[in-house]
């Protein structure tokens, strides 16, 4: 499973949204109905899945599906 697929699966699981709604440009809060607690839990799930640490100042920048994919890809490089 690619990084993109794994990130999308985490988003579906964490936010309870349909896979087809998880588009690269989708905003977690505006498009997928997440609140601030959801986004914190999402970041924690990404950290656990990919065994990375995402500092708070970086986590604040992860607001869309694509930004999450990009961050994890860079962290795994």
From Swiss-Prot:
Gene3D superfamilies: ACP-like. 4'-phosphopantetheine is transferred from CoA to a specific serine of apo-ACP by AcpS. This modification is essential for activity because fatty acids are bound in thioester linkage to the sulfhydryl of the prosthetic group. Belongs to the acyl carrier protein (ACP) family. Pfam families: PP-binding. Pathway: Lipid metabolism; fatty acid biosynthesis. It comes from Actinobacillus pleuropneumoniae serotype 5b (strain L20). One of its GO terms (cellular component) is cytosol. NCBIfam families: acyl_carrier, PRK00982.1-2, PRK00982.1-3, PRK00982.1-4, PRK00982.1-5. The gene is acpP. The keyword Lipid metabolism applies. SMART domains: PKS_PP. Carrier of the growing fatty acid chain in fatty acid biosynthesis. This is Acyl carrier protein. InterPro entries: ACP (IPR003231), ACP-like_sf (IPR036736), PKS_PP-bd (IPR020806), PP-bd_ACP (IPR009081), Ppantetheine_attach_site (IPR006162). It is found in: Cytoplasm. The modification O-(pantetheine 4'-phosphoryl)serine is found at residue 36. PROSITE patterns: CARRIER, PHOSPHOPANTETHEINE. GO terms for biological process: lipid A biosynthetic process. Keywords: Cytoplasm, Fatty acid biosynthesis, Fatty acid metabolism, Lipid biosynthesis, Lipid metabolism, Phosphopantetheine, Phosphoprotein. Residues 1-76 form the Carrier domain.
